[in-house]
């Protein structure tokens, strides 16, 4: 494939194509976020514990992580346009299935099917845009593609909370239908990307072993929460996950055409994105899952009010977004990540202090601040991931980063559920259990600061310099 940079100058910015992919990203995130204010109602409808509904979120995200690595091969084999269009169709149909679910297992199954569509939708579209953008447009493209990750969560909790309060939670999944139909039609016109006449073979063995290892890891986390003191079962599940993941890593490093090219981790900026960035993603994903549960089950608030306050958190994301690129250009990504991480640790201390007697306005300020910090870190890590890779390595870096970040999000939900279930019996009150959970998450956030110090001082200057 030819270089994205033309000999005559930088490649033109593919605005229409980028907006369509951003719209698909928006649809995917809305569906993941809109469910959170309705978790207690979904649990009541199915007769399960609210924390159990974490499976409906984590199963979707883990499916993305397992299948995203194959998305590059599928796009090369069949072409970006038909794959992207088919993915939108699958995602939209699965949304209807979620709305018609009659049990938690059925809902989880439909969410897994959504993950199949999502795994082919956003990564394929994002890679198609990156391939035609060129390095001169990288920061601009990344900024546009990350807007949905910041804007969709603002609308989704309010919409989800309003629907859950005024009607049935089942209607929250139908919002994807008009977006999906419109996106499907536009994709047939706007998406570019030729199919590879001789695509590399798909690493089926790597896909199966890695998928089994990730699934085993999620099941091991769930077994800790459910099995309680049955440590033999927990140990067996954990050992199985470790063995499968070790075998997968060995295979990926020694096969000719690996599902995921781990050797791109030799690029320091990408390696730190995978380590610190994944932990950062894990921690920030846990918060929107915990807050609606705390607001409804402990504070006694309605789904609408809890959704409104979660939206305030994501409003902070948007408010700071225009300043994220200037911040990175002025101070450098390394300094931004370190300072942002330290402030985030303090913010988790504030989240731990939230209580039902605290004025709603004060809670809103804390959540807004949390959203501001979340946005800065999120954008910095996404930019860092692609700052020093290009050419053929861009495909490998995109696949690896997308899979790892989705896995981190899925594990973030599972870890939050595990912490809450573990700490609740030990805490004097339910409110204390949530406070301890936020403090543990703050400690994990502190580890990202330590890792950020390993970045070179001039990290990512190639794409952040004026």
Kindly give the residue locations of the regions a language model identified:
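Intrinsic disorder in cytosolic terminal tails and internal cytosolic loops
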Residues: 1-13, 196, 453-466
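N-terminal membrane topogenic signal
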Residues: 9-17, 203-205
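12-transmembrane solute porter fold
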Residues: 14-39, 46, 50-59, 70-72, ...
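Helix-loop-helix hairpins in multi-pass membrane proteins, especially solute transporters
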Residues: 68-205
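Membrane-water interface at transmembrane helix exits
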Residues: 76, 191-192, 218-226, 249-253, ...
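Transmembrane helix-loop junctions and nearby membrane-interface residues
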Residues: 99-106, 188-191, 221-227, 249-252, ...
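A gly/Pro-rich, aromatic-decorated transmembrane alpha-helix motif that marks the paired
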Residues: 147, 151-167, 215, 219, ...
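Hydrophobic transmembrane-helix bundles of small-molecule transporters
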Residues: 165-276, 441-442
